[in-house]
Amino acid sequence: MAGRRGDSEQQLLTPVRIIKILYQSNPYPKPEGTRQARRNRRRRWRARQRQIREISQRVLSSCLGRSTEPVPLQLPPLERLSLNCDEDSGQGTEGELGSPQIPVEPDTVLGSGDKE
């Protein structure tokens, strides 16, 4: 069983080292030459940075076995959402400051959405 933990750490460090080498291979351009030459060098540098970023995402997804994209969050339908404040959710304090909330129908606050 010895060495198991090191294997997983090595498996995680390998893609990190590859990505580090990729970024180090593309240093920021030197600020010399005419304005147009500097602009062109920066433009080419940004294009290379985009390519490195894409390659890095591919390396991570292939080495770690999962996508780098975040998992989409499932939200309830808008029809089920409300602005009702009279429901006690159990959060907050006992002695809240200010006047009590007056329950209002959402249609009166938001309107029907029709232009007058």
From Swiss-Prot:
Residues 18-26 are annotated as: Homomultimerization. A motif (Nuclear export signal and binding to XPO1) lies at residues 73-84. GO terms for biological process: mRNA transport; viral process. Keywords: AIDS, Host cytoplasm, Host nucleus, Host-virus interaction, Methylation, mRNA transport, Phosphoprotein, RNA-binding, Transport. One of its GO terms (cellular component) is host cell nucleolus. Residues 25-49, 82-116 are annotated as: Disordered. Residues 36-49 have a biased composition (Basic residues). This is Protein Rev. It comes from Human immunodeficiency virus type 1 group M subtype K (isolate 97ZR-EQTB11) (HIV-1).
